[in-house]
Amino acid sequence: MRCLPVFIILPLLIPSAPSVDAQPMTEDDVPLASFHEQTLQELWNKRPCCPLIPGCCR
């Protein structure tokens, strides 16, 4: 009875084949890493300036 959850969860963890809806990237698509980096940069620029900590204000 202990193995029953394993047999239920294991098939969910196995990656499936790409679906038919998968489409190649277009010119307008932005890679997720680039979007994440841009978001971090915007958050960094919005931080309040703290003159007592070197390198805080850029």
From Swiss-Prot:
Residues 23-47 form a propeptide. Keywords: Cleavage on pair of basic residues, Disulfide bond, Secreted, Signal, Toxin. Contains 2 disulfide bonds that can be either 'C1-C3, C2-C4' or 'C1-C4, C2-C3', since these disulfide connectivities have been observed for conotoxins with cysteine framework V (for examples, see AC P0DQQ7 and AC P81755). The keyword Membrane does not apply. It is found in: Secreted. GO terms for molecular function: toxin activity. It holds the Pfam family Chi-conotoxin. InterPro entries: T-conotoxin. One of its GO terms (cellular component) is extracellular region. Its main location: secreted. It comes from the Eukaryota. Belongs to the conotoxin T superfamily. This is Conotoxin Leo-T2.
